A protein has these predicted regions:
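Basic/polar N-terminal segments that are highly enriched at the extreme N-terminus
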Residues: 1-4
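Secondary-structure end/capping motifs
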Residues: 225, 231-305
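Short helix-initiation/N-cap motifs at beta->coil->alpha
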Residues: 33-44, 96, 134-174, 314-324
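Short, glycine-/small- and polar/acidic-enriched structural segments
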Residues: 7, 14-145
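Pocket-lining segment of extracytoplasmic ligand-binding domains
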Residues: 147-257
């Protein structure tokens, strides 16, 4: 019997490596893997539906899924997760504490990006800064004129300006024409070396650890989506995809735990791994709904409150039904 030929777009992460190097197979499938940047993957997936299986922005997925317009159905495989305290940059010459952002101008590449949804949630829940309290300035990080991937219908109190033509938000931050900058990537160009530009939180790692201890939330950035028609035609496929991605992640964690020779080109990996386990627990990068319900509930609540979801999505309608339970031996 021939295998199902599929295209798979994903990032080049250690947790995916056993898939694309062939050590882990997706049962019943003959995949063609494409390792792409998030920006390219998400743009092509949402604009032209280029892939059978693809990594997706959790926020973009939720916008489309809540409207019944998404060509993909997600499985609870969370390829990217991050505490977004390091995503908030400010002009240190005028912003000393989070509350100083009230009434100010903050640059963003797109309003609906997952990282920015989480950053706004942090600012609102922990510091009382609502999305309506600032003016959002939308533009490219490195290149001028970045468009919003998805048409949005935002609440009337949200104020969004476009960066001046030919200008990036990194340049605006460097010149002091905006007060803050929130993005999945650091500001580029001269802003990186500007002594007046820095993180809002002086010790973002300590702040993030405190956030996790208080909330139990490890923010989810990306999910895996399967073309709806494929998932409907081959009902075994969502579970097979989830199983394969889970096995690949397990291989990556096994290698990371092998300290006989460092697998990552970075010092202090063993200490960081120990710190992650002490703070987040042994299964610190879990897939599946049950161990991530608190994080999923927080995100869907904020996503709807920020005017991005058409309705407040229930957790049991986010993913393919076959992926909410798993077998055990």
């Amino acid at each position: 019997m021939s295998k199902l030929q599929i295209s798979v777009a994903m990032g080049d992460y250690d947790r995916n490596r056993a898939l694309y190097d062939g050590r882990v197979q997706i049962d019943g499938c003959d995949p063609v893997y494409m390792l792409l940047s998030p920006e390219e993957m998400f743009f092509r997936a949402m604009r032209s539906r280029d892939f059978d299986i693809t990594e997706l922005s959790f926020s973009s997925y939720l916008v489309k899924h809540s409207r019944g317009e998404c060509p993909y159905i997600a499985v609870p495989v969370f390829l990217s997760r991050a505490f977004r305290h390091t995503s908030i940059y400010v002009r240190k010459d005028r912003i000393k504490i989070p509350q100083d952002l009230r009434g100010k101008r903050i640059g963003i590449p797109e309003y609906q990006l997952t990282a920015i949804v989480w950053a706004r949630a942090i600012l609102q829940d922990d510091h009382g800064i609502a999305p309506e309290d600032v003016t959002w300035v939308r533009g490219g990080i490195d290149t001028p004129g970045r468009p919003e991937k998805i048409k949005l219908d935002l609440p009337p109190g949200v104020k969004i300006d476009s960066a001046p033509e030919g200008t990036t938000i990194s340049e605006l931050l460097d010149r002091g024409e905006i007060d803050g900058f929130i993005a999945p990537r650091a500001p580029s160009g001269a802003a990186l070396n500007n002594p007046q530009v820095g993180w809002l939180f002086d010790d973002p790692t300590a702040t993030a650890k405190d956030y996790y201890r208080r909330t139990g939330i490890f923010p989810i950035m990306h999910v895996v989506g399967i073309r709806k028609e494929l998932a409907q035609q081959h009902r075994w496929l969502p579970a097979a995809v989830m199983k394969a991605f889970g096995e690949s992640k397990t291989r990556a964690l096994e290698l990371l735990s092998d300290t006989s020779a460092t697998k990552v080109t970075l010092p202090f990996v063993e200490e960081q791994l120990k710190a992650a386990r002490e703070t987040l627990g042994a299964d610190f990068w879990s897939y599946g709904v049950a161990p991530n319900r608190r994080t999923l509930e927080a995100f869907t609540r904020h996503h709807f409150a920020q005017g991005l979801s058409a309705r407040h999505m229930a957790i049991d309608e986010l993913f393919d039904p076959s992926t909410y339970e798993s077998y055990s031996i």
